[in-house]
Amino acid sequence: MKQLIECVPNISEGRDMNIINQVTAEIEKVEGVKLLDVDPGATTNRTVITFVGEPENVCEAAYRVVKKAAELIDMRNHHGDHPRQGATDVCPLIPISNITMDEVVVYARNLAKRFGEELNIPIYCYEEAASQPKRRNLAYCRTGEYESLSSRLGTEEWKPDFGPNEWNEHVAQTGATQVGARDFLIAINYNLNTTSTRRANAIAFDVREKGRPMREGGKVTGKPMKDENGNPIMIPGTLKSTKAIGWFIEEYGIAQVSMNITNINVSPVHVCFDEVCAKAAARGVRVTGCEIVGLIPKKVLIDAGKYYLAKQQRSLGVSEDEIMKIAIKSMGLDDLKPFNPKEKVIEFLIEDMTQKKLVDMTCTGFANETASESPAPGGGSISAYMGALGAALATMVANLSSHKPGWDERWEEFSKVAEKGQVLKDQLLDLVDEDTNAFNKIMAALQMPKKTDADKAARMEALELASQYATKVPFKTMNVAFEAFDIVEAMAKTGNPASVSDAGVGALCCRSAVMGAYLNVKINAAGLKDRAFADKIVADGAKIEAAAIKKEAEILEVVNKIINKE
């Protein structure tokens, strides 16, 4: 599955749309990157830019943004209400899906190094990318802002992580840039069945990490208490990594608790929702729902949906669409207005809507497309689809078993099987289209020019690479389909006996998927120049095929014994 990260550079220009457009145009030149938002502010004289994509592509787009901003923005002439010290003031990278924070930190520091070495801009790394504890704080890195940079540069304390440690004409124009790696920030408002801002604030103070000031006598009217240094003594709230206030919204005619969640791994959205509900209820107030401001990673809804399904002791091994529906209904995300994941979830917004997927067709449409004179989809895609159906059947048996009357205490056992089945099914569905894409790569290579010797050499190299890829894809189908035997076998042996025939058909599908994919491995490997690669993948495939045939026979023996009540 693709790794996705987000980048949110803030440039020090919020008034001149000509400059802003030139900077954002650089992002749109990078293939595989989606520009999500451009938010200029005249008062702050600052523009927040948001784009997303695979890490290497995002880093290239970020480099182009910083380079263009350095060319067009002169910090010597900049004035605005927001703290800043560079043409690109901050450039954080944020993990979205299938990537760890540690991996993002590596990308951030490599990007910072490139800014410093190639663009000669002083770079300070902050938050998770910081090289020293005090630099984790962005405010510290910007101490004194641009106006103090000339006196700070050249000192050991303010030596940049990358780039020049000196004040010169170039740095006077560009200023310094802060590069960070941070968690995704979510803005969420909880709708209350009250118009009281005071009640909303009380709930906000109950939950936000900062909490509320400690007062003499423990009364609201008591004098705020201070420590020996004169600082307010705070009673911490219950939710780490959160900030919150209460307010009244004229548009809706209700009060809300408005919250920023700065680390969804520490305080997931669903945990925050339940805690706000609990604190509100303790004050006689009810949370009727909530609204998410801006975009969110799909993980937020998936984690929430699974959390609420688990509370119901229902199987978690259902489709992502169903899981997200549970999340939306559980947290009342559609309380004030419709909530459409296609418009709010980052992963959906960056999907290539121009490319039609085979798996999005109807059964009839897919069969008709296969039967047409077009050579794709062919046996490789069909094999992957058979494997997906095999995994789906095992998942169905697991879900039926999970909810079987009298088996309530076993719901979690079957839920784990169903979850694994959903993962395998989705992997195989991806391979349906990937197999056809691999075939198309071969066709594209065959259509390359061959007029000159250089053309012919490039064409042959491209054809070899495409053919190798077209061999690897069905080989992956073999592996994933074979892995599905684990859940098929488990459901044949321990699942609902009334559905054992479904497990048997699942075994037939998985065996056919492995054998069909192996035929594609062999035919694509036959023409490869790299015989060592070809011979190895064919030999490895033969072992998987033999094991699949054996496993199918074992499962069918179990299935037939149960059907025949032997």
Q: What does each model-found stretch correspond to?
A:
Residues 111, 121-125, 134-138, 484-487, ...:
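Preference for long, well-ordered alpha-helical segments
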Residues 184-186, 438-508, 512, 524:
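Amphipathic alpha-helical interface segments
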Residues 403-449, 544-553:
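A structural-propensity feature for long, helix-poor, extended segments
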